[in-house]
């Protein structure tokens, strides 16, 4: 009988603990959140994203975001080369296309700890997001064809829909909440290959594959501002 009472008390405590933690936890008081996130990654690119998330369970949120990724520096080895096309003998990549720019959507799940610490009106916890970046499956570049004579050139757009369009990622972070506002800082790890579409662009027996190094892992740091309601 004693063992049964002990087990019953243990089960009751296990059931009540999440309820009491939820009731006293600062971060579970509001169900909806709007986020603005900025990221710098190891592919010389910045990302800007707007997202919405909803609390599904006390410490589990689901969200969806949309944004843009753009390089501020390109590390391509070549931006021109030889070609045999009509009377033209060489090609040159448009300067506007030196740096990759992509649009993306980002569905994700966020798992958070209960509130770990607070000081005055500042409340702190840890969270981790996991999801997939869904890239717009299209990329184009402008190519100018030259023959060595001034004012004799031709400009064409070449495009592809082949490339890495689904990119898994994780984002561990430290989060601080003050009333309705939140601030997060953390790291991002993904399988982003930023040049995957570029390497699939071909024109007149010329492949851009050799211009870009293959890198299957990307890391970055991000800052997030949020409003909860």
Language-model features: locations:
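Extracellular loop and loop/strand-boundary signature of outer-membrane beta-barrel proteins
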Residues: 35-38, 90-98, 154-161, 206-213
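Residues that define the transmembrane beta-barrel architecture of outer-membrane proteins
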Residues: 30-32, 42-48, 58, 99-105, ...
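Transmembrane beta-strands of outer-membrane beta-barrel pores
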Residues: 38-42, 66-72, 111-113, 130-138, ...
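Predominantly the C-terminal beta-signal and adjacent terminal strand-loop region
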Residues: 168-229
């Amino acid at each position: 009988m004693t063992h049964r009472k002990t087990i019953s008390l243990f089960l009751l405590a296990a059931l009540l603990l999440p309820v009491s933690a939820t009731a006293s936890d600062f971060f579970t008081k509001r169900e909806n959140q709007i986020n603005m996130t900025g990221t710098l990654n190891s592919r010389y690119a910045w990302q800007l994203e707007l997202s919405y998330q909803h609390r599904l369970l006390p410490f589990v949120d689901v969200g969806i975001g949309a944004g843009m990724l753009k390089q501020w520096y390109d590390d391509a080895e070549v931006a021109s080369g030889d070609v045999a096309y009509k009377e033209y003998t060489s090609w040159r990549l448009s300067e506007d296309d030196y740096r990759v720019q992509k649009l993306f959507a980002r569905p994700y799940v966020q798992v958070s700890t209960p509130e770990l610490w607070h000081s005055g009106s500042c409340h702190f916890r840890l969270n981790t997001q996991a999801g997939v970046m869904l890239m717009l499956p299209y990329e184009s570049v402008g190519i100018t064809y030259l023959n060595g004579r001034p004012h004799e050139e031709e400009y064409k757009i070449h495009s592809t829909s082949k490339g890495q369009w689904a990119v898994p990622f994780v984002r561990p972070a430290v989060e601080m909440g003050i009333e309705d506002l939140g601030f997060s800082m953390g790291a991002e790890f993904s399988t982003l290959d930023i040049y995957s579409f570029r390497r699939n662009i071909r024109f007149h027996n010329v492949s851009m594959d050799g211009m870009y190094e293959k890198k299957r892992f990307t890391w970055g740091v991000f800052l997030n501002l949020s409003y909860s309601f």
